[in-house]
């Protein structure tokens, strides 16, 4: 599509279909974000598809490939010189670890591809000293913006984030956390339709006894920590930014009342175990996104 159309369509996507990416699509995204265009001075300098101060290019690209046609699921590193993938390890026993380091965000964990970028600061610092850290911070934004635009151009979507458990993410990628460490990540997939509240909630229920809701009280942990409490005859969801009353839809599902401090949350539902105890809570935002929070004993 024309460049201005791609710019205008650029958006953050956090819902993806189960469709796989093709090798050609992955190859295109990798080339657009870290591809080598020219090497000169006997390999001392490299021009890539993204700018870098002094052509130092301090970033490395790691990939979790969940669903790419023709490539086994696993963790890989992109090798720009030669435009190749280096297999690092299988993910057969890593799913729970991924859930933990990515804070249970299903839209990231289950995406067909997850880009992880690490930085090797010394590549820039030896030449530019203190200003290097400003340069590095700006350059990762350029790389991720290229991923946004390249994704839009081929009918994919992405949403970058710097929220993850730092030391465990470094361990997962196999970097030392000092000379090389994770700075950003972004899931990529085919955008899915917005999740509507009618698809999120089940049938309503009248005259729910508030006492039956006491079992839902407690702490829930995910991207952030939430509290659920009963007070003044109502159930409340409590955040660091404020609290919001939950209107009963049925015994496990609730619609939020308007509160500008936490306006993004539209509805909440709880998942129970066989004994009726809450195991997790799912939150629907006004953007049609859902986030999971595990019950904390």
Identify the meaning behind each predicted range.
Residues 1-204:
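Acidic, surface-exposed loops and disordered segments
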Residues 199-297:
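Peripheral terminal and inter-domain segments
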């Amino acid at each position: 599509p024309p460049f201005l159309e791609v710019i205008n369509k650029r958006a953050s996507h956090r819902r993806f279909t189960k469709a796989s990416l093709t090798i050609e699509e992955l190859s295109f995204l990798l080339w657009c974000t870290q591809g080598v265009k020219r090497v000169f001075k006997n390999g001392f300098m490299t021009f890539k598809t993204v700018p870098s101060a002094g052509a130092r290019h301090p970033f490395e690209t790691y990939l979790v490939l969940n669903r790419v046609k023709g490539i086994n699921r696993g963790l890989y590193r992109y090798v720009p010189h030669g435009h190749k993938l280096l297999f690092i390890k299988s993910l057969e026993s890593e799913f729970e670890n991924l859930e933990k380091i990515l804070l249970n965000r299903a839209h990231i964990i289950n995406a067909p591809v997850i880009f992880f970028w690490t930085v090797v600061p010394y590549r820039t610092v030896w030449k530019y000293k203190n200003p290097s850290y400003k340069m590095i911070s700006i350059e990762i934004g350029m790389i991720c913006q290229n991923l946004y635009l390249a994704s839009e151009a081929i009918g994919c979507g992405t949403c970058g984030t710097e929220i993850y458990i730092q030391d465990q993410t470094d361990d997962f990628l196999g970097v030392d956390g000092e000379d090389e460490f994770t700075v950003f990540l972004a899931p990529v997939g085919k955008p899915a339709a917005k999740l509507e509240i009618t698809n999120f909630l089940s049938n309503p229920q009248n005259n729910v006894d508030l006492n039956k809701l006491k079992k839902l009280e407690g702490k829930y942990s995910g991207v952030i920590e939430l509290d659920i409490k009963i007070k003044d005859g109502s159930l409340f969801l409590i955040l660091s930014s404020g609290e919001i009353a939950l209107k009963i839809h049925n015994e496990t599902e609730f619609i939020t009342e308007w509160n500008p401090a936490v306006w993004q949350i539209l509805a909440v539902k709880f998942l129970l175990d066989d004994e009726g105890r809450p195991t997790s809570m799912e939150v629907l935002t006004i953007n049609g996104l859902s986030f999971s929070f595990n019950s904390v004993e």
